[in-house]
Structure formats: C-alpha cells, structure tokens
UniProtKB/Swiss-Prot annotation:
Gene: pth
Major localisation: cytoplasm
Lineage: Bacteria, Thermotogati, Thermotogota, Thermotogae, Thermotogales
Keyword RNA-binding: yes
Single GO MF annotation: tRNA binding
Record: active site: H18
SUPFAM superfamilies xrefs: Peptidyl-tRNA hydrolase-like (SSF53178)
Chain residues that bind tRNA: Y13, Y59, N61, N107
NCBIfam families: pth
Keyword check for Kinase: no
GO terms for cellular component: cytoplasm
Keywords: Cytoplasm, Hydrolase, RNA-binding, tRNA-binding
Protein name: Peptidyl-tRNA hydrolase
C-alpha cells in the first residue's frame, strides 16, 4: 500500500487545514523522510505490512504530476494507492473512506484523477469543518487549526490509523462500514 497525503510544501503551509494529508503522514512517521524529485517518502509497518508514505512536493493543485513517478518508484498501480486529503464539506471529527469517485471539487484529487486516468482510487477524506460565514474559502483552508481543533484532529488521526489497518486486513468495504459513520469529539 502507498498512502499519499496531500498538502502544500513549505513552512508557510505546514500546519494549515489544507495540509491535513501531510499532517497525518507526519503523525504516522515524523522523521526519516527521503526526497525524490517529485515527492518525499518514508516507510512504516502497519498491521504487519510494509506501507509507503508519500508527500507530493508539488503544490496541492498539481499533486497529479508526482503520481506517475510514485507508481514507478514503488512499482505500484492505482489500486495500491490510498489518498488522504482535506474535505471542507465534512465536519471536523469525521472521515469518509471511499473506493472510488469524483474529485468532489478538490483540486488536488482532480489532478491525481487526471494524471492516473481513473476515478478508481481509494481515498480518505478528512473533515476540516465548515468555514465561518463570510470567510473566503481559500483563507479558511490555508488557516491553521486552533488548539481545540488539534485535540480533535489528533484523535481523528488515531482513528485513521486504525482504519488503514482495517483496510489492510479486512478490506476497504469493511473500513467504510466501521469508520464512515463515526464522529470524533473532545
């Protein structure tokens, strides 16, 4: 399995809502990352399996540019990939696991679907909450989590790690049935 977390490179974006994919991978493994031309990567053991972690080094909207290089490097196919990214339409504390689907308006996922030529890509969408009324969407997704939101997010990351283990052991359908209805609260 190759877990691809989406985000924007650089310290300016490091802790923003839009970088929740990168943040999750850092939760799984905070050090010992290696860098290729188009992506950073590391490996972990999860449920007894070797799992590659990948952060595209392009900006979010160009995430797909890294994907052919990721597939070649890991000798993988689109079926081996699970993409983790933010979803403004999901409440903070919720995740949505899917086996396939459209980009749902997410430009990073849109770029990956275009690059791989298929919508049949597993994904975990991570709720980042509703933007406050009157706030620009870009300002919201490029804003940082509050201290209270971090408490929830760290619990969400624990749940997501469990969900990945279920995907590895029992399959995506089983993980969907367990985790898509859960809501993490403080």
């Amino acid at each position: 399995m190759v877990v691809v977390g989406l985000g924007n490179p650089g310290p300016r974006y490091a802790f923003t809502r839009h970088n929740v994919g990168f943040l999750f991978l850092d939760f799984l493994k905070s050090k010992d990352w290696k860098t290729e031309k188009y992506f950073a990567w590391s490996r972990i053991k999860l449920a007894g399996n070797d799992v590659a972690l990948v952060k595209p080094l392009t900006y979010m909207n160009l995430s797909g540019l890294a994907m052919p290089h990721v597939l070649k490097f890991f000798n993988a196919s689109p079926d081996d990939i699970i993409v983790v990214y933010d979803d403004v339409s999901l409440k903070l504390g919720r995740i949505r696991i899917r086996k396939k689907g459209s980009d749902g308006g997410h430009n990073g996922m849109k770029s990956i679907i275009q690059a791989l030529g298929t919508q049949e890509i597993k994904r975990i969408r991570v709720g980042i909450g509703d933007k406050p009324e009157g706030m620009d969407l870009v300002d919201f997704v490029l804003g940082e989590f509050s201290d209270e939101e971090w408490i929830i997010l760290n619990k969400v990351f624990e749940v997501m790690k469990e969900a990945l283990e279920v995907i590895l052991i029992e399959g995506t359908e089983k993980a969907m049935s367990i985790y898509n209805s859960l809501e993490v609260r403080v």
